[in-house]
Design a protein with these regions (language model features):
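Acidic, serine/threonine-rich low-complexity disordered tracts
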Residues: 1-42, 49, 55, 84-214
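Glycine-rich (often Gly-Gly/Gly-Pro-rich) flexible segments and glycine-rich loop motifs
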Residues: 60-98
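Beta-strand-rich cores of mature extracytoplasmic or soluble domains
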Residues: 46-48, 58-61
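Generic detector of bulky aromatic hydrophobic side chains
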Residues: 30, 47-48, 65-70
Length: 214
């Protein structure tokens, strides 16, 4: 999996979101590409307002699991609380009935030390995620969030098709790489108007909003 934060934004249900571009590459082949639409509120909570995943099967490309907040009863959810703590109520990360997406989460552990390929990290937060609409045996995912980096590891408990991931690289893109990522995110968003018409029809196109130079 390759996760890229782009300079592309998209208005979703009246909220300007940042567009993330994810790629799932297996044995050198692109299996899935996804746009995820994130936003942060004034309190510091990070929200998920929609996803546009494209599934690649040979030359066939489809997007059956696309969803946007406010369309087809889909609702936004919190990806990360501003001040995540243990022993607090579980929270919803989003719900989209037509896309069969529904995730709940809770803080499982705080201030952990976790070592992966890119190094060892202190202060790691472990978040337990699960789909309440699935059977208990379908399992849980545990995502390890390192301060200033993001997710560095994903482990699983139960389930036959759970993903496990370990971070192998974390870096800033070159200007050319960032430009290419922006272009691909805009292209994928454009595909949404033909491959996920029912979801995308009423949404404005994504647009490039370059970050201020540092």
């Amino acid at each position: 999996m390759i996760f890229t934060v782009t300079e592309v934004t998209k208005m979703v249900n009246g909220v300007r979101t940042v567009v993330l571009w994810d790629r799932d590459i297996q044995e050198g082949q692109l299996v899935e590409e996804e746009l995820a639409f994130w936003a942060q509120d004034d309190s510091g909570n990070v929200w998920l307002l929609g996803e546009y995943p494209e599934e690649h099967e040979g030359k066939k490309v489809s997007a059956p699991a696309a969803w946007l907040t406010g369309i087809q009863q889909a609702t936004a959810g919190i990806l990360m609380r501003a001040e995540p703590k243990m022993n607090t109520p579980q929270y919803e990360q989003g719900k989209a009935p037509r896309a069969e997406f529904h995730d709940l989460a809770n803080v499982f552990a705080e201030n952990q030390q976790t070592c992966v390929d890119i190094g060892c990290f202190d202060g790691v937060l472990v978040v337990d995620e699960w789909d309440p609409d699935q059977q208990p045996q379908d399992g849980h995912q545990f995502k390890y969030h390192a301060p200033g980096v993001g997710i560095i590891q994903v482990t699983a408990l139960g389930g036959d098709e759970q993903e496990t991931l370990v971070a192998t690289e974390h870096r800033t893109l070159t200007p050319d790489e960032l430009a290419a990522a922006n272009a691909r995110a805009l292209e994928l968003d454009g595909f949404g108007y033909t491959r996920a018409k029912a979801v995308y029809a009423g949404s404005p196109p994504a647009e490039l909003v370059p970050r201020p130079a540092r």
